[in-house]
């Protein structure tokens, strides 16, 4: 933050601001999370050990109807949210909004913006408080990036802007951004910073859980790009082609045609939720950060890479003899050299992946692929130049990240083996035995009666059981091999290339078996059980009936309750 402030003040001085002494990074983190019933949670060892479900077939109803997002908040969840807000405000955390998110049982909480370091600490407190308050309500708050397959995962949108201590927002384009040279210079520096350090920015959001979320047609892709919207994209195109922008697209007015309703002003910008780094009015929104992670890493990277771009711009312009000419030239140069990172289209599409490859943009689909960016020469030079990290500190962090990935994956693999061996396979064996017994009894009782259904189920179940057993054996061998690797980077790489595919191979047949095996036999709550509307214990009536015991009359208080599903 200090490095960013120093370089941003240099930019302000170039435009005649002699009053501002500091520029602060203002941050607001939108925290997403899932809420499940604690009673059901305790029956899922994968949720307890890893924070996510390692097995689970899709529920009949997911998020297809799009009826969860901003829908009515369920009463029990609403009481949890109200209690959470009270606890947060007691600590000075200004929680201001809460709503349902896209997936069933998914929600969001967001605070009022704070200075970056304060926002980071408050977000850590928020996550801890969420878990504590949820327990108080008989619930569990899941902060994992992908607790359930097949529906949206959870992220943490990191909204950030640059504000001087005199109250000026450096990212406010004004009504005519084409004439706002200070804003255009700041914008061009951000574009330059993100393009030059896209791999480092991707690394800042890398965590094992995000490997399950990013690029899954629900969250930002693993490819870093910037969305500017129609208005600013038009200004950038004019600058790239002509050196300056003569005008800009203006917002329109929406006339509903109803005399009793006012005419509505339309914003000149638009939204693109498929972009990982989007300009939204007067701020940028970095959407890659995982829901369980601290926002410190991403904001440290953003602050430093933007500070570097500001420093280079100030070095050039402070020597200028014709400031207006040179600032226009520098803005055009930055935008021309780094426009490849600008993209307003669908970030989920395969066409974008192909286009990004043609543009030379890095595509780092997993954590292990992203970690090396932390120790690249350009990264080390930048962090050391601004006194943020030394080379030794970056190498240490790199080792910790590799170790974290390897240990997390190993825990998930061992949990899968435990659940498969102790829960799923024994349950399926009991089911096949029941089918076989049914076939024998039907044939004995009535040879003419058909047993085709039982035989088909037995055959299909037996085949899937064999696949699961073989996959279990392969995963056991992979885990044993992993245990013999000493180098943490090699171990993490093996986990990505060997353990994770073996885990998928074990999950596939067991998820299919879940759709076949009798629910009474299935050993754990299903996705439908976990994500159904969180039950609410309703007190119906408390009464004191008289119970006769011979000549004596005893009074007892009886509470009748039921759980709404």
PLM region descriptions:
Residues 1-143, 152-155, 162-399:
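Glycine-rich, acidic/polar active-site loops that bind/position phosphate-bearing ligands
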């Amino acid at each position: 933050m200090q490095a960013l402030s120093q370089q941003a003040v240099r930019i302000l001085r170039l435009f005649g601001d002699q009053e501002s002494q500091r520029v602060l990074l203002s941050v607001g983190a939108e925290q997403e999370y899932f809420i499940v019933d604690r009673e059901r949670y305790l029956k899922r060892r994968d949720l307890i050990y890893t924070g996510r479900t390692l097995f689970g077939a899709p529920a009949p109803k997911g998020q297809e109807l799009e009826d969860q997002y901003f829908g009515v908040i369920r009463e029990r969840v609403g009481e949890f949210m109200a209690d959470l807000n009270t606890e947060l405000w007691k600590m000075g955390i200004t929680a201001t909004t809460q709503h349902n998110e896209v997936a069933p049982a998914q929600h969001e909480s967001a605070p009022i913006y704070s200075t970056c370091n304060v926002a980071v600490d408050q977000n850590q407190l928020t996550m801890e408080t969420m878990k504590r308050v949820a327990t108080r309500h008989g619930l569990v708050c899941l902060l994992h990036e992908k607790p359930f397959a097949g529906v949206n995962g959870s992220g943490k949108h990191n909204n950030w802007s640059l504000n001087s201590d005199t109250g000026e927002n450096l990212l406010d384009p004004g009504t005519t951004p084409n004439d706002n040279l200070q804003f255009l210079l700041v914008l061009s520096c951000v574009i330059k910073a993100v393009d030059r350090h896209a791999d480092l920015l991707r690394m800042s959001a890398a965590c094992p859980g995000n490997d399950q979320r990013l690029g899954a047609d629900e969250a930002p892709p693993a490819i870093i790009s910037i969305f500017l919207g129609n208005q600013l994209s038009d200004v950038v195109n004019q600058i790239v082609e002509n050196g300056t922008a003569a005008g800009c697209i203006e917002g329109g007015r929406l006339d509903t045609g109803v005399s009793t309703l006012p005419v509505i002003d339309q914003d000149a910008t638009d939204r693109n939720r498929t972009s990982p780094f989007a300009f939204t009015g007067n701020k940028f929104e970095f959407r890659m950060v995982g829901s369980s992670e601290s926002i410190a890493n991403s904001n440290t990277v953003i602050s430093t890479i933007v500070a570097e771009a500001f420093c280079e711009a100030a070095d050039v312009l402070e020597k200028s003899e014709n400031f207006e000419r040179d600032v226009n030239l520098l803005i055009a140069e930055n935008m021309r050299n780094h426009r490849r990172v600008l993209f307003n289209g669908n970030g989920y599409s395969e066409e974008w992946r192909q286009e990004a490859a043609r543009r030379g943009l890095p595509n780092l689909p997993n954590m292990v692929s992203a970690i090396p960016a932390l120790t690249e020469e350009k990264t080390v030079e930048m962090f050391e130049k601004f006194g943020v990290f030394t080379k030794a500190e970056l190498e240490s962090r790199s080792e910790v990240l590799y170790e974290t990935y390897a240990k997390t994956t190993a825990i998930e693999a061992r949990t899968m083996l435990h659940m498969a061996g102790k829960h799923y396979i024994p349950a399926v064996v009991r089911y096949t035995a029941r089918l076989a017994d049914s076939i024998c009894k039907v044939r004995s009782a009535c040879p003419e009666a058909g047993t085709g259904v039982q035989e088909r189920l037995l055959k299909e179940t037996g085949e899937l059981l064999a696949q699961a057993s073989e996959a279990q054996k392969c995963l056991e061998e992979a885990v044993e091999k992993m245990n013999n690797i000493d180098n943490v980077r090699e171990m993490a790489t093996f986990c990505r290339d060997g353990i994770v595919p073996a885990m998928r191979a074990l999950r596939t047949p067991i998820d299919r078996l879940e759709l076949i095996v009798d629910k009474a036999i299935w050993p754990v709550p299903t996705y439908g059980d976990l994500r159904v509307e969180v039950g609410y214990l309703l007190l119906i009536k408390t009464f004191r009936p008289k119970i006769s015991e011979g000549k004596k009359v005893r009074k007892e208080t009886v509470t009748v309750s039921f759980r709404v599903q």
